[in-house]
Amino acid sequence: MSVEILDLRHFSSSDLRPLLDEEAQLWSKLLAWDYSNSAEMILRYIDARILPGYAALEKGRICGYSFFVYEGSKGVIGDLFVEGDGVRYASPTEHPVETRLLAHVIETLQQSPGIHRIEAQLLVHPTGAVARPFLEDGVHRSPRLFMVLPLASDGKDG
């Protein structure tokens, strides 16, 4: 697969909407999370050309993206998504597009003046699935837990 990585600011919301729609479905399926408001905000920032990040293109079509923001002296990786991320891979080495996108983001943040720390919480990815680019750059990893407590009533009072 020949994938080109380009600056996200070259694209419009209409270019990325199908990908973000797929991502919203994955958030709903995996985390019971309504990602639609976040997706709409991302698309607005893309149209305003103010969201730094990268898009992965295959045969002229966007197949993945990642973005980051600057927050004081740290860079925060806001998201990483590649079409088909709902398909679970057997090993972390089977994520070539994710790996390339993250490598570009990490390198950009490392070269950004005043940035002394990089953070990311990529919740839709299984633990360790996309860790390789971080670990290769000597990043310290802190485990996180995503916990769910069903609050729906079971029909009983009290």
Per-segment meaning from a language model:
Residues 3, 51, 136-140:
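Short glycine-aromatic motifs
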Residues 39-103, 107-109:
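Conserved donor-binding loop and adjoining core beta-sheet/short helix segment
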Residues 10-13, 71, 125:
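Short, surface-exposed acidic/glycine-rich loop or hinge patches that mediate macromolecular interfaces
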Residues 86-87, 91-158:
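Acyl-donor-binding surface of acyltransferase catalytic domains
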Residues 14-17, 36, 40, 95-96, ...:
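Generic alpha-helical secondary structure signal
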Residues 1-37, 156-158:
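Short amphipathic alpha-helix that is part of the acyltransferase structural core
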Residues 21-40, 60-70, 112-119, 130-131:
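Short, charge-rich amphipathic segments
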